[in-house]
């Protein structure tokens, strides 16, 4: 069975668990699987990278994108910024100018010095695709790793049914590891490997 859309995924889950009375629960299994998938560092892959320009307020705060998972790099006018603790950043005497540092404060980034209107801040980060739903039939993760979605949802179904989900868990872990291996192979193919450390 093809696994390219939300409807096909739901139908496949129903076939695998061989139950006709869990139609209302299957979307929950998928949602729980999504939560687990995107909390896993192994899903930090190039297809989930995004670049945005950040706007700041008068105090040097910028709201983190709603689909943010983890930072890769943050630049001001093409120069990388150094991340420090919020306590350290807040101890500095306020001043305006081209930022050198940033820190995270809940759902915001704080920059120092406070950027001016002439400064451009660019964030490169890993993002979480929109959840699958009847109105969002697919996303990049389902396209890249349908087995991860399937086995992840089957693990949640096994929990719900009080059944042994170890074989589904094995399939889930195998799928994630293959996704990571494929991603690394594609990233490094034909080039000198360069590993960048991410930070949440």
Regions found by a protein language model. Name each.
Residues 1-200:
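Glycine-enriched, solvent-exposed interface loops adjoining structured elements
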């Amino acid at each position: 069975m093809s696994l390219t859309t939300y409807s096909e995924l739901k139908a496949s889950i129903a076939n695998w668990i061989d139950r006709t009375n869990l139609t209302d629960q299957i979307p929950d299994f998928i949602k729980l699987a999504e939560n687990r998938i995107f909390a896993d560092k192994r899903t930090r892959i190039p297809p989930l990278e995004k670049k945005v320009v950040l706007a700041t307020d008068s105090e040097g705060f910028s709201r983190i994108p709603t689909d943010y998972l983890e930072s890769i790099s943050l630049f001001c006018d093409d120069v990388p910024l150094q991340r420090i603790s919020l306590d350290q950043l807040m101890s500095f005497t306020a001043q305006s100018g081209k930022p050198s540092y940033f820190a995270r404060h809940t759902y915001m980034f704080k920059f120092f010095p406070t950027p001016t209107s002439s400064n451009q801040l660019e964030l490169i980060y890993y993002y979480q695709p929109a959840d699958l739903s009847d109105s969002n039939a697919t996303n990049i993760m389902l396209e890249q790793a349908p087995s991860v979605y399937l086995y992840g949802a089957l693990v949640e179904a096994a929990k719900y049914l009080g059944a042994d989900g170890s074989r589904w868990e094995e399939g889930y872990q195998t799928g994630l590891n293959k996704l990571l291996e494929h991603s690394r192979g594609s990233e490094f193919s034909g080039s000198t490997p360069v590993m960048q450390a991410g930070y949440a």
